[in-house]
């Protein structure tokens, strides 16, 4: 598995990329492989204050539904509206099709997340 090294990862299979003062969040290639063809991405509440690990949204496939979690404490500031009409964008390119953006309460919280090698160990473990 070749993972982008310009971002962090969670044990629940989200990727997190810093862009200015917000974190862009999506699901990993491994997660979308496990889920299969996505049919719905949503239930993301822009403006919601979340703690790390709280449910930020949901992805549904023909096989299963899975929650997406906030990687850090923060406020959801954007949802990728393109995914409402085309959830399969994640299947096509999991590492470019972001789901939501979160403004962290403390940007240093990202230091608690996994780097690419750490995530690879979890995903393959």
Curated annotation (Swiss-Prot):
GO BP term (any one): glycine decarboxylation via glycine cleavage system
One Pfam family this sequence matches: GCV_H
Keyword Thylakoid included in the entry's annotation: no
Cofactor notes: Binds 1 lipoyl cofactor covalently.
Keywords carried by this UniProt record: Lipoyl
Cofactor(s) the record lists: (R)-lipoate
Domain of life according to the entry: Bacteria
GO cellular component: a single term: cytosol
Domain Lipoyl-binding: 22-103
Gene3D superfamilies documented for this protein: 2.40.50.100
Modified sites of kind N6-lipoyllysine: 63
Similarity comment: family membership: Belongs to the GcvH family.
Annotated function: The glycine cleavage system catalyzes the degradation of glycine. The H protein shuttles the methylamine group of glycine from the P protein to the T protein.
Subunit text: The glycine cleavage system is composed of four proteins: P, T, L and H.
Name this polypeptide is given: Glycine cleavage system H protein
Annotated source species: Bordetella avium (strain 197N)
């Amino acid at each position: 598995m070749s993972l982008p090294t310009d971002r962090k990862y969670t044990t629940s299979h989200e990727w997190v990329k810093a862009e200015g003062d917000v974190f862009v969040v999506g699901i990993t290639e491994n997660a979308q492989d496990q889920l299969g063809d996505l049919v719905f991405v949503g239930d993301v509440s822009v403006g919601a204050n979340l703690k790390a690990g709280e449910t930020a949204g949901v992805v549904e496939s023909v096989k299963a539904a899975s929650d997406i979690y906030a990687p850090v404490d923060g406020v959801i500031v954007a949802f990728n509206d393109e995914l409402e009409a085309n959830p399969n964008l994640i299947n096509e390119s999991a590492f470019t099709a972001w789901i939501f953006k979160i403004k962290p309460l403390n940007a240093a919280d990202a230091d608690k997340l996994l780097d690419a090698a750490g995530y690879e160990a979890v995903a393959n473990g």
